[in-house]
Every structure is written in structure tokens, then in C-alpha cells.
Amino acid sequence: MTAYLLERAWVGGRVRDTVRVEVEHGRITSVEPDATRTGVPLRGLTLPGLANTHSHAFHRALRGRTQTDRGTFWTWREQMYAVAGRLDPDTYYELAKATYAEMVAAGYTSVGEFHYLHHQPDGTPYDDANAMGSALLAAARDAGIRITLLDTLYLSSGFGAAPEGVQRRFSDGTAESWHERVSALAPLTGAASLIGVAAHSVRAVPADALEAFAPYVEDGVPVHVHLSEQVKENADCVAAHGVTPTRLLADHGVLGPMTSAVHATHLTDEDVRLLGEARAFASFCPTTERDLGDGIGPARALQEAGSVLTLGSDSHAVIDAFEEMRAVEMDERLATQARGHWTAAELLAAGTADGHRSLGFGDAGEIAVGQRADLVTIDLASPRTAGTGRDEHTAVFAAGAADVTHVIVDGVVVFEGDHGQVGRALDDVIGRIWNP
């Protein structure tokens, strides 16, 4: 048993002082606010572990390299494909490990990896058909982060169009072949990893193939899908099927309480209602959505309809859980010219317990007895946090990833403040990808 003494901690929906937390076999066994007994000190404000519900690890190699020209999501996508064409299982492992280490240093303790980079550049499977997925599982393990590998079905480059170029790496050819490959992943998982599934998007999964997800939805498996990130996708879907992407998913049994609609940016009122009635998660990725010029999604309307907000860093233009949380509120302010749409407590729930639950880790995201022992401590005396009140508002509206001093995942200390080492590892591997 290990006991930690938390100077301040977010417990039971509020900040408490001098909280003693006992940990045994990776679980929290005791939580004692206003404690008089001692423990390993964690000075600052300690939060439950944060969840990154949408990641494409290899996109991290694009940061700072896509800002030179005007363009759109679609022109950015061509640059992303260039990186996708350079990776093999070994380089993918190295890049993902460094990216996940950056997440850990930012306070993330779980990640949902939306994985579609499956095969060799010409589309031929590796001898081990899951070599790339195995690389991601190993990278997460070695970086110290829990992972839900969301193995992704990708069959078309657009409505009715075959994959072309690097997209051939993404496709298994048929939904049946994809399901067969995914089924072989289960033996590779452990206590810190799960397998979920994803439909890349309605443009990349033909309508008849969407039915492959209904059994996963019925079984409560995490099912994620890019949804209505772009206006063009909506228009193309209506032209092809006569309905919006959300309605198409609903009609084919893809929506349910363990479904995550990623982005959910350009929705009709009926779309919001359908997602809410399904009690689906809405995985917003504000830093990526603003980087790509996607737009601002209806976060509050979705929550009020019954959906549950979670947060991801997606393309990793920024890896900062605190920035993602506050960006939801800040974007709403820009869109409405009014303040106060989300409380700090609501945004912390989105960033912690609700996010973990959407990834299949319903026993993470709270500092409570029986929960996984995930603790994230932030400095309360940094230039960003000093003088801010030392409570949940400090975490959501002032702190940044650079303020994280300690991270514990499943009772194991995985980060102790060396942000410099994280940067050096990223610089090394990304440099070799661009200049082999």
C-alpha cells in the first residue's frame, strides 16, 4: 500500500484540502480529506486523470508544418497523407510512444486512438495483419498511458469512390475482412488496454457496411465515428442518401450509449435530437477544430438534449487537456457573445470521468474508493496559476500542460515533471520521419 498526501484535490465535485489517498494494486482504497496522517506529498492541486477521447498519433508529426499557405481541411488532408505514407510499424511505434509521452506529461491517463493506418503503402497487409495496431498498443504501454485502440473501418475515399493512393493503407477491402482482423486483436490487450471500433466516416464507410457496427453497439463496445466535421460531407451525404450523416447512422443502428460522435460540428436540430435520444457521447476536439477551420459545434445543445461531452486532441496541433476544456466555453462565448455556458465542474467532468467512460474505462476519472488510481498534480505557483484561487477554476481557466508536475496511472508514477525529456524524444523521432 502507498499513501499520498495531496495538498489540494478535486474530490466529490469540489476542492478539498490535505487529502490522504491510499492506493493498493492500482486502485484507490481510501480517501480522507483534512487528513492528519502522513503520506507521500503531492504539492499543488491534484485532479483525477484526464481522458483524451480522440487521437491520431501520427498527426503529431504535422505540428507547425501546415500553416504556411491558405487552405481548408481538404488541403491539410493531403499533407497528412504524406506523413501516413512514410510510416512502418517501427517508426509508428516510436512516434506514437513519444506522442503518448507528451499526453502523459499533459495529464492524460487514457487515450482513445482512432486507428486506420493498417497496411503497407500499397495496401498489402503486413505478415502480421495487426502490426500497426500492435505498435500502438506497445507504444501506449511503454509511455505509461492506458489505451482504447479504436480499430477503424475505411472502405471508400468518398461516397461511391474506391480508396486511392495512401488511402489503400487504410482499407481492409470489406467489412468482413476488417471484422476478422479486429477479432485477432483481443489477445493483445491487458489491464491497461481495450479494443473498440470506429467507422471512419459516412464518406469512408458505405451505408450497407455501417450495419457491421450494430452488434458492437448492442454489446456496449466503444464505437467512435467522425461525424459532420465538414459542411461538404453533409452535403455529399444528403446527395448520396437523402439524409444527414447522423440520420444515416441512426437508421443503420450505429447510435447508442457507447457511441462517440467525434466533432459533431455541423448538425441540424434533428441531428442533435437523435444523438441526445441515443445518449451518445460527443467528442469535441476544439484545438484541432479551430486549427483546421472546421467551425464551432453545438456543445451545449447536445448536452441539453442528452448527449455527454468528452474531449480529444485529435491532430495534436496542441496536446493540452486544460486548453481543450476551457476552449469549449471560450468557443461558445465567441459564437454567442455571452459568457457562462459551462461551469468549471462540468468541463472537468467532460475531461475526466465522462471521457474515460466513453473509452470503456468506467472505473477511472474520479478520486474515489474503488477507482483506478489516476492522479494528476498541477503547480499552483506557476506564472499561469499563481494568484488564481487554487480551485477548479484554476485548473480549467488558467492552467496549462506545462503546469503538470506529477502523473500517476493505475498507481504507478509515470511522470515527475521532466517536460524537457518529452520534447527531446519528439524532436528526435519527428526529425527522422521527415529526414530519413
Region locations from a protein language model:
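Active-site gating loops and adjacent loop-to-helix segments of metal-dependent hydrolytic enzymes
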Residues: 61-94, 120-129, 156-176, 231-256, ...
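Metal-coordinating catalytic core of metallo-dependent amide/deamination hydrolases
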Residues: 122-262
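Histidine-centered catalytic micro-motifs
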Residues: 48-60, 222-231
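His/Asp/Glu-enriched, well-ordered alpha-helical/loop segment
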Residues: 251-258, 300-382, 398-399, 408
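Histidine/acidic-residue-rich catalytic or RNA/ligand-binding cores of hydrolases
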Residues: 64, 231-243, 271-276, 293-302, ...
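Alpha-helical scaffold segments that flank or form the walls of functional sites
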Residues: 64-146, 177-190, 426-435
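Histidine-rich, glycine-flanked metal-binding segment
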Residues: 1-2, 8-48, 185
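Active-site microenvironment of metallo-dependent hydrolases
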Residues: 1-19, 24, 352-436
